[in-house]
Amino acid sequence: MGLGLWIRTGILMTLLTVVLVGIGYLLGGTGGMIIAFTLALFMNLISYWFSDSIVLNWYNARIVSEEEAPELHYIVEKLARQAGIPKPRVAIVPTMVPNAFATGRSPRNAVVAVTEGLLQLLNKDELEGVIAHEISHIKNRDTLIQTIAAVLAGAIMILVDFARWSLWFGAYDDERDSGSVIGLILAIILAPLAATLIQLAISRSREYLADETGARISGKPHALASALMKIEEAVRYRPLRRGNPATAHMFIINPFRGIDFAELFSTHPPTEKRIERLRKIALEMGIIF
């Protein structure tokens, strides 16, 4: 892992730790801050070593063998070879919402996950375009930061839920407790916003890069553009209802569109702009679509 990636990972962990500690202070003063800092250290350790397993478990994703999904394995192996990385493991997510993501702290520990809905929606060329995009995230070492961000942002959201429950069911009788109520309200409002802004900082530019790298790996920018349009339309019609919004930035298209902050603070560039960039890449490759 290069120095630049170590620095980016360290900055991400530090920022999310600060958010966690801030929530802890708002919830419980100095004691809450100490507990939150301890939790942050534990979550940083867990997120580095086990974040891929955590994310896969969130979506009940199942690692599949070549015998179970021969064509999918063939595509992943071919594109990984063209990208010059080890073949990732392959997982299928049991949902009809079409989407895909990659996870893992390094190319040797990586997993490419696709949903059942994606396999049904796309043709072979489009599927290659999507998988090439995910392979590019692995090649560009985005998956470590993306997955750590998902796990730590998930921890932040758990604390926010705790703050919400405390606000609803707590007993606040004197003026001193009014400060606690204000703290809880601030935590509920500001913490998700902070986590989202941090996700934005690591996501948008990397999506453009993965689109470009993936298009050049597969040689089919038009197929990726077509896949993005299909997935975008499907997600708008039927967004993912079960899952962790903290993982939104990991997917090729935000699957939670329409049910949270996603429209105001999108973790992805507009699909139209991504397709326009793919058109330019296609022209460079002598492809018109």
UniProtKB/Swiss-Prot annotation:
It is an enzyme of class 3 (hydrolase). Zn(2+) binds at residues 133, 137, 207. One of its GO terms (cellular component) is plasma membrane. Its cofactor is Zn(2+). The active site is at 134. One of its GO terms (biological process) is proteolysis. Keywords: Cell membrane, Hydrolase, Membrane, Metal-binding, Metalloprotease, Protease, Transmembrane, Transmembrane helix, Zinc. Belongs to the peptidase M48B family. This is Protease HtpX homolog.
